[in-house]
């Protein structure tokens, strides 16, 4: 953890020198709880995607933005649909074809334009177009037709 904190501190200083706000995505291929580190850097914007539904009902630091990941997988689908109905958290959904205007009653925005999820309006679906192997994924529930 000390290395991560050192890297964030160095990045923060570089961003300050450049006059830009630092933004860090710690969980790219994981879903690790970094809340203690995030709290140490209140002037840094942190953001992640997650499938951990418990985070939807927790009080998060104001500098931490989560976008939940949709899946139609049995057992998870009902939970993520509940998040969509009960909270204003954004949910990322991968679509096989063109992005629809709405999904599950929410406006769909084009999430492929950039990865700055913390700049998105609340209560939206972050639409992503299927790429690579996902285009041929017809069984996992990850891609919506």
Where are these regions (language model features)?
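Class I S-adenosyl-L-methionine
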Residues: 1-145
């Amino acid at each position: 953890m000390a290395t991560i904190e050192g890297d964030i501190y160095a990045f923060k200083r570089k961003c300050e020198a450049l006059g830009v706000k630092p933004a860090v995505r710690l969980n790219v291929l994981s879903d690790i709880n970094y809340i203690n580190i995030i709290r140490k850097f209140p002037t840094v914007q942190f953001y992640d995607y997650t499938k951990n539904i418990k985070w939807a009902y927790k009080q998060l630091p104001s500098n931490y933005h989560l976008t939940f990941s949709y899946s139609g997988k049995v057992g998870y689908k009902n939970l993520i649909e509940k998040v969509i109905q009960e909270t204003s958290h954004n949910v990322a959904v991968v679509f096989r074809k063109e992005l629809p205007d709405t999904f599950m009653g929410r406006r769909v925005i084009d999430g492929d334009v950039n990865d700055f999820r913390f700049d998105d309006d609340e209560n939206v679906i972050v639409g992503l177009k299927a790429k690579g192997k996902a285009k041929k994924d017809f069984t996992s529930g990850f891609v919506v037709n």
